[in-house]
């Protein structure tokens, strides 16, 4: 069976994860556009998948492609401001308010992540849908070759977009 998965579902979750890592490291991890192949595998494994019809690219722009130019001008300084803050504000349950605010930005520019959805007459969560496809992220590996690492050996790819420090 052929599927058309939503890239934006992975993008939404990756931006939130990257922001959390940036805040946790006091800005030592770059919060910017870009990512690695592992971000996709991690996203599928931890968050699941949704069909493109549930969160299509460009849905907020009336286009078939997403435009991140304004999004980046809004989101990047927001995360930088959180990093520079002296004390993070929390709600009554101790949850950081900035995550809710960032989710609002992501929802405004990318679209809202579905908690549940119906696909071909059956109700799914993103995780149950991913499981139903039979796609196993553990069946895939990153391949790279750099002359300063031994060939045919795993290593952490030292590039800015590999902020998860995956091999």
Q: Where in the sequence are the language-model features?
A:
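Catalytic-core signature of thiol
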Residues: 1-167
